[in-house]
Structure formats: C-alpha cells, structure tokens
UniProtKB/Swiss-Prot annotation:
Designated gene of the protein: hisC1
BP term (GO), one: L-histidine biosynthetic process
HAMAP family reported for this sequence: HisC_aminotrans_2 (MF_01023)
Summary of subunit composition and partner proteins: Homodimer.
Family matches, as Pfam families: Aminotran_1_2
Protein name from the UniProt record: Histidinol-phosphate aminotransferase 1
Membership in a protein family: Belongs to the class-II pyridoxal-phosphate-dependent aminotransferase family. Histidinol-phosphate aminotransferase subfamily.
Key words of the record: Amino-acid biosynthesis, Aminotransferase, Histidine biosynthesis, Pyridoxal phosphate, Transferase
Annotated source species: Bacillus cereus (strain ZK / E33L)
Any one GO MF annotation of this record: histidinol-phosphate transaminase activity
Cofactors, names only: pyridoxal 5'-phosphate
Reactions the enzyme catalyzes: L-histidinol phosphate + 2-oxoglutarate = 3-(imidazol-4-yl)-2-oxopropyl phosphate + L-glutamate
Length: 370
C-alpha cells in the first residue's frame, strides 16, 4: 500500500519542543516556552466562565454552521455572515482552500520563508510551488507578480509574515491587487493581525468589496490566546466562500471551540491589554539588539526574529539547556537566526540576559582569533 507520490516528498509538521519533553531531556524543573507564538498572558477570564457551562452539551454534536459565533464575528468585522468560513484553526482553512482550488497543472505563488503549510498543502494537491525570496525580510510583491500566470490559483501573502514579523505596507498591496490577474486568489493570512499597529499596515476587509479575488484569514489562536481550541476563519467573496463550504468537514469546529471563541471575542479590553504588553515586550528586545549590535527585524507580531552571530541551531540548543525554548531559524531556512516569542516581562528579562552571554562569548571568540 502506497500513498500519493507527492506525500513521499514531504515531512510531517514538526512543532517546537513541548515543556515536558524538554524537562525530561535536560533534567530541568523550570521551562519557559517561547517557541510557538502563544499568548503568554493566557486568555480572557470569560473563556473560563464559558467552559463551566458546557458540561451538559458534551454528548451532542456541535452546531455545524457555528451560527452564534458566525453572527458575532460578522458583526465585529462588519461583514456578512455568508462571507465567513470557519475551520479547526487556520491550518484546516488552508487545507480546505488548497483542496478545493489546487490540482496538477496549477501553481501557487508565495514568499520564502513564510508559513510552511501553504507549500505543504500545495504539494499534496499536486500543484507547482513558486517561491520568491523575501527582500529585506519582506514579501517582494513585484517579483511575486512576475511569477503569476494563467495557471496561478493562489497567491499567499502572510501579513505580518511568519517567521520574520515583517509586513507588506498598504500602498504596495494596493498596487499588487490592481496588477494581479483576477483569476488568481490573493490570500492575506493575518494570523497576527491584532498585533499589527503600523500606520501603513493595510486594512484588508474594506477591500473585499472591490477585489473579489481577495480573501483574508484570521485566527483565535494568537492574540486571543485560544491555541488549544483550534479555531480560525476566512473572510471572502460570498460566492467563493459558499463553494468552499463543500470542502468543509461536517461539525469541524467543536462546541467548546465555538463557545470560547465567542467569549474571547466579547472581551476586547483583555485583547487590547495583551497587545499593549506585547508591544512593551518587543521594546525590551529592541533595546537589547541596539545595545549589543544584534540584527533584528522590527516586528508587527508577538515574536521577534534576530541574529546573534552564531548558528541558529547552536543558539537554540544552548538556550534550551538553560530552560528556554525558542525556534531555530534553520527550521525556516535562515540558519543564522532564531525566532523568540515575546513572553512575560520577567521571562523577556531572563532570556535577554542569556542572549547577552551568547553575544559576549561570540565577541570574545572572534577577538581571540583575530
């Protein structure tokens, strides 16, 4: 028995190491996980309240249409309920879109590096993947446009981008949307939207009416702190969303996920407090990078990508032995960098002290051999 040939070329997704795994491996009692861009402040207290009322529903199938959540998300965003497609996290939404649109003979255009699942699902569906290197850490939309042809079904734009935290500014996106063929679906993956505060960061939802080939993805996993519950959604053209519903599994979002997402959505004050604290945390890293002359990408997310002057895998291992889990840039094809999730203030302070040690050791080593 053999699976599709294209599956043999892929590897299963490898998430960052979990806390218990690292404790066992290194004999540590305290672990700080700053690898998966989770919200260090948790989730709204309203989520806990919502969970206590669900016990009587455990034996029942969920609302397959997610009516209440759909209604409130549409109201929050100012869109029609028919424009929303819900999934078990954005991973499933990406899978649904890829399954519905891609096949052998088609192609997708994306940046490199960017979120890995765009590439993964394109390969599974037999589509050609056309990757364009980032320019100064940012999507090179001009170069990406050159890769688009009549067989391009999807153009993926991760904005802000994972793993660099950078963003495509409004005017460049508008120029791209005007130039790209209407036959290509331009998907803006805005998983980190709530953290993006730059003045020229594009607000894409108002653009949906003009550009029918535009789609926006958002999630409750990041700023809302609901990663464990797996719920995200797409916003797009009503006709296309209706067609994509056919590819959605029945009851794909659980009663629990729908309920906690609704509770989290209602507590915008908690969300804004998380965003504020995250911005303060980013500035802790910026101050370190500037003082120690460490390269970094200014971030519009809850993580920062930086280069310490040593291989990312080495930095990853050395930090992990101290009880701090980060993500090596090697996982994204940037061998000399690491990605660090912004944590609590004290967590940021602690890991920054370790980063200083790594930088100082490297400087001393270079001076010895110079």
């Amino acid at each position: 028995m053999r699976v599709k040939e294209q599956l043999l070329t892929l590897r299963a997704y490898v998430p960052g190491k979990n806390i218990e795994e690292v404790k066992r491996e290194y004999g540590l009692s305290k672990i700080v996980k700053l690898a998966s861009n989770e919200n260090p402040f948790g989730c709204s207290a309203r989520v806990t309240e919502a969970l206590t009322s669900l016990a009587s529903q455990y034996a029942l199938y969920p609302d397959g249409h997610a009516f209440e959540l759909r209604t409130q998300v549409a109201k929050h965003l100012g869109v029609k309920v028919e424009q929303l497609l819900f999934g078990s996290g954005l991973d499933e939404v990406i899978q649904m879109i890829s399954r519905a649109l891609l096949h052998e003979g088609t192609n997708v255009v994306m940046a490199n590096p960017t979120f890995s699942q765009y590439h993964h699902h394109a390969v599974i569906e037999g589509a050609e993947v056309r990757e364009v290197s980032l320019k100064d850490g940012i999507h090179d939309l001009d170069a990406m446009l050159q890769q688009v042809d009549d067989q391009t079904k999807i153009v993926w734009i991760c904005n802000p981008n994972n793993p660099t935290g950078t963003y495509v500014e409004k005017q460049k996106l508008l120029s791209f949307l005007e130039a790209v063929p209407k036959s290509a679906l331009v998907i803006m993956d805005e998983a980190y939207y709530e953290y993006a505060g730059a003045e020229d960061y594009p607000q894409t939802l108002p653009l949906l009416e003009k550009y029918e080939n535009l789609m926006v993805l958002r999630t409750f996993s990041k700023a809302y702190g609901l990663a464990a519950f797996r719920i995200g959604y797409a916003v797009g053209n009503t006709e296309l969303i209706g067609q994509l519903e056919v590819a959605r599994l029945p009851f794909n979002t659980s009663t629990v996920a729908q309920s906690v997402a609704l509770a989290a959505l209602e507590d915008q004050a908690f969300l804004q407090e998380c965003v504020k604290k995250n911005e303060e945390g980013l500035h802790q890293y910026y101050a370190f990078c500037k003082e120690y002359n460490v390269f970094y990408y200014p971030s519009q997310t809850n993580f920062i990508f930086l280069k310490l002057g040593i291989p990312g895998n080495e930095a990853f291992e050395r930090l992990m032995k101290k009880g701090y889990i980060v993500r090596s840039g090697a996982a994204f094809g940037i061998d000399d960098g690491i990605r660090i999730t912004v944590g609590l203030k004290e967590e940021n302070d602690e890991i920054i002290e370790l980063l200083k040690e790594l930088v100082n050791e490297q400087v001393q080593k270079e001076e010895t051999y110079s």
